[in-house]
Amino acid sequence: MANLKELRSRITSVSSTMQITKAMKMVSASKLSKAQDAITQMRPYSEKLTQLLQDLSATLDDDAGSKYAEEREVKNVLIVAISSNKGLAGAFNTNIIKAVKYKAKNDYKAKNIDIYTVGKKANDILKKEYDIHKNNNEIYDDLSFENASAIAEELMQLFLDEKYDKIVLVYNQFKNAATQIVQHEQFLPIEQFDSEENKQLDYIFEPSKLEIVKDLIPKSLKMQLFKALRDSFASEHGARMTAMHKATENATELRDDLKLSYNKARQASITNEILEIVGGAEALNG
Protein backbone atom coordinates (compact mmCIF):
# COMPACT_ATOMS: atom_id res chain seq x y z
CA MET A 1 0.00 0.00 0.00
CA ALA A 2 1.27 3.46 -0.87
CA ASN A 3 2.53 5.54 2.05
CA LEU A 4 0.50 8.42 3.49
CA LYS A 5 2.64 11.16 1.97
CA GLU A 6 2.31 9.72 -1.54
CA LEU A 7 -1.45 9.31 -1.15
CA ARG A 8 -1.85 12.90 0.08
CA SER A 9 0.13 14.12 -2.93
CA ARG A 10 -2.04 12.13 -5.36
CA ILE A 11 -5.26 13.37 -3.73
CA THR A 12 -4.09 16.97 -4.07
CA SER A 13 -3.11 16.43 -7.71
CA VAL A 14 -6.42 14.78 -8.64
CA SER A 15 -8.41 17.47 -6.82
CA SER A 16 -6.55 20.16 -8.74
CA THR A 17 -7.25 18.41 -12.05
CA MET A 18 -10.92 18.06 -11.08
CA GLN A 19 -11.19 21.81 -10.49
CA ILE A 20 -9.71 22.49 -13.94
CA THR A 21 -12.02 20.08 -15.77
CA LYS A 22 -15.04 21.42 -13.88
CA ALA A 23 -14.14 25.00 -14.82
CA MET A 24 -13.64 24.02 -18.48
CA LYS A 25 -17.01 22.27 -18.47
CA MET A 26 -18.72 25.42 -17.19
CA VAL A 27 -16.99 27.62 -19.79
CA SER A 28 -17.93 25.24 -22.61
CA ALA A 29 -21.52 25.07 -21.35
CA SER A 30 -21.76 28.85 -21.52
CA LYS A 31 -20.29 29.00 -25.03
CA LEU A 32 -22.43 26.08 -26.16
CA SER A 33 -25.61 27.88 -25.16
CA LYS A 34 -24.78 30.82 -27.43
CA ALA A 35 -23.50 28.64 -30.28
CA GLN A 36 -26.57 26.40 -30.11
CA ASP A 37 -28.90 29.40 -30.28
CA ALA A 38 -27.01 30.71 -33.31
CA ILE A 39 -27.17 27.47 -35.33
CA THR A 40 -30.81 26.84 -34.32
CA GLN A 41 -31.84 30.27 -35.58
CA MET A 42 -29.81 29.91 -38.78
CA ARG A 43 -31.06 26.50 -39.93
CA PRO A 44 -34.59 27.52 -41.03
CA TYR A 45 -33.21 30.34 -43.20
CA SER A 46 -30.48 28.13 -44.66
CA GLU A 47 -32.93 25.32 -45.43
CA LYS A 48 -35.42 27.72 -47.03
CA LEU A 49 -32.69 29.31 -49.15
CA THR A 50 -31.54 25.88 -50.32
CA GLN A 51 -35.11 24.84 -51.12
CA LEU A 52 -35.69 28.02 -53.11
CA LEU A 53 -32.50 27.44 -55.09
CA GLN A 54 -33.56 23.86 -55.81
CA ASP A 55 -36.99 25.00 -56.99
CA LEU A 56 -35.58 27.66 -59.31
CA SER A 57 -32.74 25.49 -60.64
CA ALA A 58 -35.21 22.79 -61.65
CA THR A 59 -37.14 25.26 -63.83
CA LEU A 60 -34.11 26.46 -65.81
CA ASP A 61 -33.25 25.17 -69.25
CA ASP A 62 -30.14 22.98 -69.47
CA ASP A 63 -28.23 25.63 -71.42
CA ALA A 64 -28.88 28.24 -68.74
CA GLY A 65 -26.91 26.43 -66.07
CA SER A 66 -24.64 28.34 -63.72
CA LYS A 67 -20.87 28.35 -64.03
CA TYR A 68 -20.86 27.05 -60.45
CA ALA A 69 -22.71 23.94 -61.61
CA GLU A 70 -20.26 23.02 -64.37
CA GLU A 71 -19.48 19.33 -64.29
CA ARG A 72 -15.88 18.57 -65.27
CA GLU A 73 -13.75 15.47 -65.28
CA VAL A 74 -12.64 15.22 -61.68
CA LYS A 75 -8.86 15.30 -61.52
CA ASN A 76 -8.17 17.71 -58.66
CA VAL A 77 -10.15 17.62 -55.42
CA LEU A 78 -10.05 20.07 -52.51
CA ILE A 79 -11.32 18.78 -49.17
CA VAL A 80 -12.23 21.48 -46.65
CA ALA A 81 -11.60 19.91 -43.23
CA ILE A 82 -13.29 21.93 -40.48
CA SER A 83 -11.83 21.23 -37.04
CA SER A 84 -10.96 23.36 -33.99
CA ASN A 85 -7.96 25.23 -32.66
CA LYS A 86 -8.14 23.58 -29.23
CA GLY A 87 -8.22 20.02 -27.99
CA LEU A 88 -9.79 18.31 -24.95
CA ALA A 89 -12.99 17.80 -26.94
CA GLY A 90 -13.26 14.03 -27.00
CA ALA A 91 -13.32 12.55 -30.50
CA PHE A 92 -14.41 15.82 -32.13
CA ASN A 93 -11.21 16.44 -34.11
CA THR A 94 -10.26 12.78 -34.45
CA ASN A 95 -13.53 12.02 -36.24
CA ILE A 96 -12.88 14.77 -38.81
CA ILE A 97 -9.35 13.54 -39.49
CA LYS A 98 -10.57 9.95 -39.86
CA ALA A 99 -13.35 11.05 -42.24
CA VAL A 100 -10.94 13.03 -44.43
CA LYS A 101 -8.51 10.12 -44.64
CA TYR A 102 -11.31 7.70 -45.46
CA LYS A 103 -12.71 9.91 -48.23
CA ALA A 104 -9.26 10.52 -49.67
CA LYS A 105 -8.45 6.81 -49.69
CA ASN A 106 -11.78 5.45 -50.93
CA ASP A 107 -13.76 8.13 -52.79
CA TYR A 108 -10.91 10.05 -54.42
CA LYS A 109 -8.17 7.44 -54.52
CA ALA A 110 -7.02 8.18 -58.08
CA LYS A 111 -7.36 11.98 -57.77
CA ASN A 112 -4.96 14.73 -56.84
CA ILE A 113 -6.08 15.75 -53.37
CA ASP A 114 -5.33 18.94 -51.48
CA ILE A 115 -6.67 19.89 -48.06
CA TYR A 116 -7.97 23.27 -46.93
CA THR A 117 -7.86 23.09 -43.14
CA VAL A 118 -9.98 25.24 -40.87
CA GLY A 119 -8.64 24.93 -37.35
CA LYS A 120 -5.22 24.03 -36.00
CA LYS A 121 -5.93 20.45 -34.92
CA ALA A 122 -6.74 19.01 -38.34
CA ASN A 123 -3.85 20.91 -39.91
CA ASP A 124 -1.30 19.52 -37.42
CA ILE A 125 -2.16 15.93 -38.38
CA LEU A 126 -3.18 16.12 -42.04
CA LYS A 127 -0.13 18.14 -43.15
CA LYS A 128 1.98 15.05 -42.46
CA GLU A 129 0.20 13.07 -45.20
CA TYR A 130 -1.39 15.56 -47.60
CA ASP A 131 -0.65 18.81 -49.38
CA ILE A 132 -2.27 21.65 -47.47
CA HIS A 133 -3.63 24.29 -49.82
CA LYS A 134 -4.21 26.67 -46.92
CA ASN A 135 -4.80 26.70 -43.19
CA ASN A 136 -7.23 29.14 -41.60
CA ASN A 137 -7.07 29.40 -37.81
CA GLU A 138 -8.32 32.97 -37.53
CA ILE A 139 -11.97 32.38 -38.48
CA TYR A 140 -12.85 31.40 -34.90
CA ASP A 141 -11.58 34.74 -33.60
CA ASP A 142 -14.63 36.31 -35.25
CA LEU A 143 -17.05 33.74 -36.66
CA SER A 144 -19.15 36.18 -38.67
CA PHE A 145 -20.98 35.80 -41.97
CA GLU A 146 -18.57 38.29 -43.54
CA ASN A 147 -15.50 36.24 -42.63
CA ALA A 148 -17.16 33.00 -43.69
CA SER A 149 -18.14 34.66 -46.98
CA ALA A 150 -14.51 35.57 -47.61
CA ILE A 151 -13.53 31.90 -47.38
CA ALA A 152 -16.48 30.88 -49.57
CA GLU A 153 -15.50 33.43 -52.22
CA GLU A 154 -11.95 32.08 -52.16
CA LEU A 155 -13.25 28.54 -52.71
CA MET A 156 -15.59 29.67 -55.49
CA GLN A 157 -12.73 31.41 -57.29
CA LEU A 158 -10.56 28.29 -57.07
CA PHE A 159 -13.35 26.35 -58.77
CA LEU A 160 -13.94 29.00 -61.44
CA ASP A 161 -10.20 29.13 -62.18
CA GLU A 162 -10.34 25.33 -62.62
CA LYS A 163 -7.71 24.80 -59.95
CA TYR A 164 -10.06 22.18 -58.52
CA ASP A 165 -12.81 20.20 -60.19
CA LYS A 166 -14.60 19.33 -56.98
CA ILE A 167 -14.67 20.94 -53.54
CA VAL A 168 -16.19 19.14 -50.56
CA LEU A 169 -16.80 20.05 -46.92
CA VAL A 170 -16.11 17.70 -44.01
CA TYR A 171 -17.40 18.92 -40.65
CA ASN A 172 -19.26 17.95 -37.48
CA GLN A 173 -22.98 18.69 -37.56
CA PHE A 174 -24.43 19.62 -34.19
CA LYS A 175 -27.29 17.44 -32.94
CA ASN A 176 -27.01 17.87 -29.18
CA ALA A 177 -24.31 18.31 -26.55
CA ALA A 178 -23.50 14.60 -26.57
CA THR A 179 -23.92 13.87 -30.28
CA GLN A 180 -22.09 15.28 -33.29
CA ILE A 181 -22.51 13.77 -36.76
CA VAL A 182 -19.68 13.95 -39.30
CA GLN A 183 -21.00 15.38 -42.57
CA HIS A 184 -19.50 15.11 -46.05
CA GLU A 185 -21.10 17.73 -48.31
CA GLN A 186 -20.38 18.67 -51.89
CA PHE A 187 -19.70 22.39 -52.09
CA LEU A 188 -18.81 22.77 -55.76
CA PRO A 189 -19.99 22.11 -58.35
CA ILE A 190 -23.47 22.72 -56.99
CA GLU A 191 -25.72 19.73 -57.35
CA GLN A 192 -28.46 19.99 -59.97
CA PHE A 193 -32.04 19.21 -59.06
CA ASP A 194 -34.61 18.11 -61.58
CA SER A 195 -37.97 17.14 -60.15
CA GLU A 196 -41.33 17.36 -61.87
CA GLU A 197 -42.80 18.70 -58.65
CA ASN A 198 -40.40 21.64 -58.66
CA LYS A 199 -40.97 22.35 -62.33
CA GLN A 200 -44.69 22.77 -61.69
CA LEU A 201 -44.21 25.51 -59.10
CA ASP A 202 -45.62 28.84 -60.20
CA TYR A 203 -43.38 31.82 -59.44
CA ILE A 204 -43.47 35.41 -60.61
CA PHE A 205 -39.89 36.48 -61.38
CA GLU A 206 -38.55 40.01 -61.24
CA PRO A 207 -36.25 40.87 -62.99
CA SER A 208 -35.81 37.38 -64.49
CA LYS A 209 -35.52 33.78 -63.39
CA LEU A 210 -31.94 33.44 -64.66
CA GLU A 211 -30.74 36.64 -62.99
CA ILE A 212 -32.26 35.61 -59.69
CA VAL A 213 -30.60 32.19 -59.79
CA LYS A 214 -27.22 33.70 -60.70
CA ASP A 215 -27.47 36.01 -57.69
CA LEU A 216 -28.88 33.34 -55.41
CA ILE A 217 -26.19 30.70 -55.98
CA PRO A 218 -23.25 32.66 -54.46
CA LYS A 219 -25.43 33.63 -51.49
CA SER A 220 -26.48 30.02 -51.01
CA LEU A 221 -22.85 28.81 -51.14
CA LYS A 222 -21.78 31.39 -48.58
CA MET A 223 -24.63 30.36 -46.32
CA GLN A 224 -23.74 26.67 -46.76
CA LEU A 225 -20.18 27.28 -45.55
CA PHE A 226 -21.28 29.60 -42.74
CA LYS A 227 -23.76 27.00 -41.52
CA ALA A 228 -21.04 24.30 -41.60
CA LEU A 229 -18.75 26.53 -39.52
CA ARG A 230 -21.55 27.30 -37.06
CA ASP A 231 -22.43 23.63 -36.78
CA SER A 232 -18.79 22.77 -36.13
CA PHE A 233 -18.42 25.53 -33.54
CA ALA A 234 -21.46 24.33 -31.58
CA SER A 235 -20.31 20.71 -31.92
CA GLU A 236 -16.87 21.58 -30.54
CA HIS A 237 -18.24 23.09 -27.35
CA GLY A 238 -20.80 20.32 -26.95
CA ALA A 239 -18.07 17.70 -27.31
CA ARG A 240 -15.76 19.55 -24.91
CA MET A 241 -18.48 20.03 -22.31
CA THR A 242 -19.33 16.32 -22.46
CA ALA A 243 -15.65 15.31 -22.30
CA MET A 244 -14.96 17.58 -19.32
CA HIS A 245 -18.09 16.35 -17.55
CA LYS A 246 -16.88 12.78 -17.91
CA ALA A 247 -13.35 13.75 -16.87
CA THR A 248 -14.73 15.46 -13.75
CA GLU A 249 -16.76 12.37 -12.87
CA ASN A 250 -13.69 10.14 -13.30
CA ALA A 251 -11.53 12.50 -11.23
CA THR A 252 -14.16 12.56 -8.47
CA GLU A 253 -14.31 8.77 -8.41
CA LEU A 254 -10.51 8.48 -8.33
CA ARG A 255 -10.24 11.08 -5.56
CA ASP A 256 -12.81 9.21 -3.45
CA ASP A 257 -10.93 5.94 -3.96
CA LEU A 258 -7.66 7.60 -2.96
CA LYS A 259 -9.26 9.12 0.13
CA LEU A 260 -10.55 5.69 1.12
CA SER A 261 -7.08 4.20 0.65
CA TYR A 262 -5.58 7.10 2.63
CA ASN A 263 -7.99 6.59 5.52
CA LYS A 264 -7.31 2.85 5.57
CA ALA A 265 -3.55 3.44 5.52
CA ARG A 266 -3.83 6.06 8.26
CA GLN A 267 -5.97 3.74 10.37
CA ALA A 268 -3.46 0.92 9.91
CA SER A 269 -0.62 3.25 10.85
CA ILE A 270 -2.40 4.36 14.02
CA THR A 271 -3.21 0.77 14.94
CA ASN A 272 0.43 -0.24 14.51
CA GLU A 273 1.57 2.65 16.69
CA ILE A 274 -0.89 1.65 19.42
CA LEU A 275 0.27 -1.95 19.25
CA GLU A 276 3.90 -0.84 19.52
CA ILE A 277 3.11 1.31 22.55
CA VAL A 278 1.16 -1.48 24.24
CA GLY A 279 3.90 -3.96 23.42
CA GLY A 280 6.54 -1.64 24.83
CA ALA A 281 4.55 -1.07 28.02
CA GLU A 282 4.08 -4.79 28.54
CA ALA A 283 7.81 -5.36 28.05
CA LEU A 284 8.60 -2.76 30.71
CA ASN A 285 6.10 -4.26 33.15
CA GLY A 286 7.46 -7.74 32.51
From Swiss-Prot:
One of its GO terms (cellular component) is proton-transporting ATP synthase complex. GO terms for molecular function: ATP binding; proton-transporting ATP synthase activity, rotational mechanism. It comes from the Bacteria. Gene3D superfamilies: 3.40.1380.10, ATP synthase, gamma subunit, helix hairpin domain. GO terms for biological process: proton motive force-driven plasma membrane ATP synthesis. Belongs to the ATPase gamma chain family. Produces ATP from ADP in the presence of a proton gradient across the membrane. The gamma chain is believed to be important in regulating ATPase activity and the flow of protons through the CF(0) complex. F-type ATPases have 2 components, CF(1) - the catalytic core - and CF(0) - the membrane proton channel. CF(1) has five subunits: alpha(3), beta(3), gamma(1), delta(1), epsilon(1). CF(0) has three main subunits: a, b and c. This is ATP synthase gamma chain.
